[in-house]
Amino acid sequence: MTSTGDPRGRTDGLGWVSRAVFGDDRIGLTVDGAPPAGHRVLARYTVVPSVERARFLLPRGATRATAAALLAYNALRPPKIRAVRAGLGALARIGVLDAARFPTLTVSLPADVDPAGALLAAHLAELLGVRPAYAACGIRPPDPHHKPTLQVFAADGRPLGYAKIGWNDATRALVTAECAALRALPQASGVDGHPVTPRLLAELTWAGQVVAVVEPLPLAVRGVPVDDPPRIGALLAVARRGGAPAAPRPLAGSTFLARLTTEAARAAAADDTMATATAGSGVEQSGTSRAGGGERAGARAVEAVAALARRHGDTAVEFGHWHGDWVPWNLGRHAGNLVAWDWEHSGPDVPLGFDLAHDAFQRALVLDGQPAGAAAAAVDAHLAAHGAALGLSAAGRRLVADAYLVEMWLRTWRLAAGGAGWNPALHPALLDVVEKRHSG
């Protein structure tokens, strides 16, 4: 095989993941080559299937850990991906992957450098108290919305933890938010209908990145069907953190409306600089636009929030927490309980019903490939069918739908402002939808 240079200089998925996982400049990385002079080898990874089409970094020399990296939680994956991972996992279990002619990534450090102070995987092994520990990582095309995640396993294949890496402003904010949510959830987890949630094991600042180390899910967890009906009890428990209902309050004067107003004003102030901020992210973006996404989008958001207040200011609803990304692919079942993960968009003080609205919106947008307007109509239909079970009146359901759509556009703006670029499925289409609803 031909030796190649340090993959951190690449612009593809392998380069993106390598920069995130091996960010310390003291780390030597070589593909099918010897480490730099004076370095000692700390780890080797199999690059599957090739450098140019890399999809996995799998640890070498630990067949059970490598197999577990491919097979753990496979029941949660779509059938085609499940089949590929099952085949590779079977090969890993009998040691064939290590013997196959896949490229090998060698990780090294100068002899006098403590691995736990430079290598994230070594630091995680020390933090989790298991040595040796082995890390694996999936690879996808570079995307400023996504976070490389290290899966850490013991030599016997036991999952020890998952480390999400926030590497730009947008993803650092998401990882920080998930850490805050997980710190607050243990008392409610599994109580009075609240879904079971993985524990936060640690929050780290590492090589300029923010890292959330999260407890593994139960190995026997199974996904919920994509057509699973709303779990009203769980939605109420999440909103109330397992506690009692809060008294309804009008939208006018709420801290929720105040936050939307502040965020829209920030978006308006950034109208003239957004294109420069997004273009400066330094990542070849996938599924996002590097441009500012339309003139005066922030000013339009200011008017959208004002119109929301005019239209619904007197309507009273219960406010509470939300998961923030309540969709079938973030939910599972284990031992008779609902399990929920990926809490990075969670937050307090939103109208009760936001998670129900989000579920409908994302099913239509992601699963059915519908445009933003059709996804908004799906929100209306879902709330009409199930909102009463949450205690929402007809006026409350209309408030929740309209407020949720504004919230979603502001989320889209926050990600773009953090360097993730505009999501073309949501901008400018979602602003157009909001304006049309408010003018109707």
Question: Language model features by range: what are they?
Answer:
Residues 127-155:
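ATP-binding glycine-rich phosphate-binding loop
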Residues 150-177:
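ATP-binding glycine-rich loop module of kinase domains
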Residues 147-152, 310-354:
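Active-site acidic catalytic loop and adjacent metal/ATP-binding pocket
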Residues 199-208:
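Short beta-strand micro-motifs within the conserved protein kinase catalytic domain, predominantly
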Residues 181-192, 218-263, 302-316, 324:
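Conserved kinase catalytic-core helix
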Residues 354-391, 405-418:
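Active-site activation/catalytic loop segments of kinase-like enzymes and analogous catalytic loops
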Residues 70-138:
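Juxta-kinase regulatory segment immediately upstream of eukaryotic protein kinase catalytic domains
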Residues 209-219:
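Conserved short submotifs of the Hanks-type protein kinase catalytic core
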